[in-house]
Amino acid sequence: KRQEYASHFYEAYHAWNNYSADPKNINKTQEFSLGWLEDFKRRKEQGITDEVTVDATGKYVYYGNEDYYDALYKKTTFAQDHNLSVTGNNGKLNYYVSGRFYGYDGLFRYNTDNYKMMNLRAKGSVQVFDWLKIENNMDFSNMDYHNPINVGEGGSIWRNISDEGHPTSPIFNPDGSLTFSAAYSVGDFIYGKNGIDTNNKVLKNTTGFTASFLENKLHVRGDFTFRNTDEGQTQRRVPVPYSTHEGQTVELSAKYNDLKESNMRTEYIATNLYADYEDTFGDAHYFKGMVGYNYEQSTYKSTYVQRNGLLLDDSENINLALGDAITCLLYTS
């Protein structure tokens, strides 16, 4: 099928240009000529299966039969979901604890999109006295996600495969280096350096009480809640090495060589305190009254730091970048 792709590309390009122009490249990453197309046909007829040759200048010439989506996706993947709960009650004390872990090993064959989620909930109450009950409800979650990215100009992996994942261009050169077409697309994932790592944590807790007085006619209730939400991201972008000539290495998107760290924190607190009184007088008159107080506050803080000039392609700490830094701080309440 590889030679048919090259022929169809030529026919489509030639027709689009009113049969007056021949292509010089397949988009930007593979050279094209009528001589190359004829050579491709000849190699097919002669049963030559080598996908890469080297011309007199040392440049690689490709006659590939590559399936870029086969290289992009795994044949199989694995996900796991575990749940556990414990409950108990002895009359004065009751509790419920549950936990969940979900893990997904990702869909991509290289630099895969791992996802992990952990949830924990614990709630309970205790009847301290006949007139006083205390309750607590805690919820915690932690999420980790790795999102691989492309530094090629197209942005997404699917767009870049559409633009540059030519079946006639293999992914690897004979020396194991990436081809130009691969570097623009799935080769970025194979290199495995570019991506966004996200970690989100949420901790919420509510503590409350209920008190009864005057033969259960007066009730006082109160609670205090806090919720801390932490959102963190680390993005790394580095150039992708590839080769078009034997023994020579160049870099795609050399302008990208940076690390960005983003941290956002939201702190929320709320408290409620109210009392109600109800009574029936003389079997004919009913009275009920309520008074209460509420307070809420939310504070948001964010820090954004980006710095270029990474010492190593796999640096994970902003301190391992020696270039220019951009810092942004935000605070709202």
Which sequence ranges carry the predicted segments?
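A beta-strand signature from Gram-negative outer-membrane beta-barrel systems
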Residues: 1, 79-81, 94
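N-terminal hydrophobic signal/anchor transmembrane helix of membrane proteins
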Residues: 211, 217, 226-228
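Periplasmic N-terminal accessory/gating domains of Gram-negative outer-membrane beta-barrel systems
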Residues: 67-73, 77
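Outer-membrane beta-barrel initiation region
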Residues: 74-76, 86-90
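Surface-exposed loop/interface segments of Gram-negative outer-membrane beta-barrel transport/assembly proteins
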Residues: 1-65, 102, 106-204, 221-330
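Residue-level signature of outer-membrane beta-barrel architecture
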Residues: 88-90, 126-127, 209-213, 277-279
